[in-house]
Amino acid sequence: MATLAMSTPSSPTWPKRRPKAWAMRCERYCCAAASYFPLAFVYSLTTWAVYVEASVGLKPSSSSWIGLPSSILGVVLYLALNISYTTAVFTDPGSPLGARSGGGHPYSALPITELPEYTSYTVNSTGGSRFCKKCQCPKPDRAHHCSTCKRCVLKMDHHCPWLATCVGLRNYKAFLLFLIYTSLFCWVDFGVSAIWIWTEVFNDTRYMDGILPVNVVLLSILGGIIGLVLTGFTAWHISLATRGLTTIECLEKTRYVSPLRKALDRHRYDGLLGTNTGGENQDTFGSRLQNYGNQILDAHANAIPGVTRPEEGEESSDNLTPAQQALSRSYADLERQREHDRYEDYLAELDNEKMPHAFDLGWKRNLLHLFGDRPLHWLVPTPTTTGNGWEWEPSRKFLEAQERVRQQREQVAEQQRQHQRDLYLRNMNNSRAWLGNELPPGWTPDQPLSHSDDVARPATGVSMKTLAPRSPRPRPGEEVYAEDLDKDDFVLEPTRGKGSGNQSSREDDWRDWD
C-alpha cells in the first residue's frame, strides 16, 4: 500500500513559453525608429524650405523685396526654429517621480529622496487628493499622467506627436518659441516665393526650363497652408501663456478643493444641537483640557502618517465601513446622509464652475514665469522657467472667490442648523405641554431633562365608573330594590321556603347582566 501511495502520478508540468529575445529587440527598435520619424520629417522639410528660399534670394531678381537680406532672414529663422525644436524634443519636461534608482533590485522602484511638501488646490473627481496609481506617486497641481510616455508630467500641456514627447514645465518655453519661429519662417518663405513667382515667372520665361520654378511653387503652397494653420495654433498658445493656462486646463474642467468641506464636517458633528454656541464659556477646565489634547494631536499628526492623519496621495476614507454603518445606523439615517452628501457634491460643482482660474497671476507675471526674469534669455530656447512644479501660487481673485463661497456656504449651514434647533425645541415643548409647564429658559437640547419638578397628572373628570354600563333594573341593596320587595311580600309569602333559591336566582340574573 505504501508503494501504491508513493507511486501516484503527478500532474504534468508544461514548459513556459518565453518570448524570443530577438523578437522583443526588433519590436523595441521599430518603436524607436517610428518615434524618430517626426523628427526626420521636420528636419528634412525645413532644410528643403530654407534651401529653396535662399536660392531664390541669391539669384538676380527685379524685385527689391528679394535679395541677400531675405536669404539671411530665412537662414536665421531656420536655425532658430531647429534649435528650439531640438531643445523641446530632448529636454525632460519634468516628472514628480524624479530620479529613481535603476537596476533589477527588488526595491529599485522605491524613491530615494523625500518628496517636497506642497499645498494642493486641485482635487480628483471624488474630491480627494490627486494620486497616480500607475506611477504610485502623488500628483501635484497641474500634473497629469501621459499614457504614451507612461509617466506623470509636471504642468503637462499636451503630448505632441511632432515632438514625440510631452510638453510640460521644462520644455514649454522651447515649444512656444518653436511655434513662433516656424510661423515666421513659413510666412517669409510664402512671401519670397509668391513675389518671385509674380515678378519672374509671369513676366519672363527664362526659368521655365529648370527645376527652380517647381520648388518655388511648392514652397509657396506649403508655406501658405502651414503658415496659416500654425499661426492660429501659435496665437492660441500665446493666449494660454498670457492667461496662465495649459491646454488640458483650457479644454477640461479643473476641480478645485472645497473651501469649507472640513469646516462643514466639524460643525455637523460639534454644533448640530447647539453645543458650539457663541455664548458658551470657553474658559472652563474641560474646554482648556480639550484644547490641550487637540494641540498634542496636531503636534504628533506627522509622526504616523496614515494613522493620525490621512497620508498624502491617498484618499481619506470614513472611519466606519458601509457594513458597520448599516449595523450602527438605520436605513433612514443612511439614506438621509446619502441625500445630504449628493446635495453637497452638487453645490460643490456649482461653486467650482463659478471659481476663476487659480493660477492666473496676470499676463506679466505669467510670461515672467514662462520666460524667466532675464530679458536676454527670452528669445533663446533655454530652460529658464521658474518654479519646481510642486508649489503654485494662487491668484488673489481665486482666494477672494474661495473666501466668498466659504462665507456663503457657512451662512447657509448656520441657517439650517438654526432651523433644526428651533424645530427640535418646538417638538420638545409640544411633547411636554401636558405637564402643565414649559422648558427652562436656559435649557439647550444637549442638556438632560430634570424630572424632579414633575407634577402629578391632572384629573380629567371622567372615571371608569362613569364609562361602565348600567342596568335599567335596580341592583340588590339599592333603595328602589328594597321598596319593590316590600310591595311584593304578599306575592312571596306563600313561597317563603323557597326565598333563598329565588334570591340566588336574582343574583345570577344580575351577574349575567354584568
From Swiss-Prot:
Coiled coil stretches, renumbered: none
Tell me which species this is from: Emericella nidulans (strain FGSC A4 / ATCC 38163 / CBS 112.46 / NRRL 194 / M139)
GO BP terms in the entry: protein targeting to membrane
> Residues on the Cytoplasmic side?
1-31, 86-174, 231-514
Provide the membrane-side ranges marked Lumenal in the record. 53-64, 196-209
Post-translational modification here is noted as: Autopalmitoylated.
Q: Which family does it belong to?
A: Belongs to the DHHC palmitoyltransferase family. PFA3 subfamily.
InterPro entries for this protein: Palmitoyltrfase_DHHC, PFA4/ZDH16/20/ERF2-like
Q: Where is the composition biased (Polar residues)?
A: 318-328
**Gene Ontology cellular component list:** endoplasmic reticulum; Golgi apparatus; vacuolar membrane
Its record classes its membrane topology as: Multi-pass membrane protein
Question: What is stated about domains?
Answer: The DHHC domain is required for palmitoyltransferase activity.
Can you say what this protein is called? Palmitoyltransferase pfa3
Q: Which residues form the DHHC domain?
A: 130-180
Q: Where is the composition biased (Basic and acidic residues)?
A: 505-514
| Biological role stated in the UniProt entry | Palmitoyltransferase specific for VAC8. Palmitoylates VAC8 at one or more of its N-terminal cysteine residues, which is required for its proper membrane localization.
Q: Does the keyword Membrane apply?
A: yes
Show the stretches that span the lipid bilayer.
Answer: 32-52, 65-85, 175-195, 210-230
Q: Name the segments for region: Disordered.
A: 307-336, 436-514
Q: Which reaction does it catalyse?
A: L-cysteinyl-[protein] + hexadecanoyl-CoA = S-hexadecanoyl-L-cysteinyl-[protein] + CoA
